[in-house]
């Protein structure tokens, strides 16, 4: 890619995204990620609500509208061939995610954490310092706003 960039004088933005979520996400429980899975399951009135793994597993979730904003900023103002992490830069525990979804869906089931099930890397949050300092990026949405908008979108399908 770098060679092509030099040959054609093409500006190439390199983006390393975190865990995006939002409207038009994949909500198929067999193949989707944790955010749409929790939204869909909460809306199906599961009670008790069994969640695999630990509530302490932490991820850098990012609402898709902010992800797009970050990607466009890299393309418009970023240095060609320089990688930028596009994320929120903030860790959200799976337990916090669950309670944000419960709040957005207005559900209150009994929660059971099943620690015997597989889990993943305990902490995965990207530094977005370069994106903030060099390109002036700031997310427009809070995590909770993104969850609420995504939930409302899914409910209105």
Question: Language-model features: where?
Answer:
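N-terminal Rossmann-like NAD(P)+-binding domain of SDR-like oxidoreductases, especially those catalyzing
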Residues: 1-26, 65, 141, 156-157
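Glycine/proline-rich active-site loop of Rossmann-fold NAD(P)-dependent oxidoreductases
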Residues: 8, 20-36, 45-48, 64-68, ...
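Residue-level signal for the nucleotide or nucleotide-sugar donor/cofactor binding architecture
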Residues: 29-33, 59-65, 92, 119, ...
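Generic alpha-helical structural context detector
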Residues: 36, 40-44, 69-73, 99, ...
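C-terminal "lid/loop" region of Rossmann-like NAD(P)-dependent oxidoreductases
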Residues: 54, 81-84, 92-99, 106-123, ...
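Non-catalytic, hydrophobic alpha-helical segments
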Residues: 67, 71, 86, 97, ...
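Amphipathic terminal alpha-helices
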Residues: 143-157
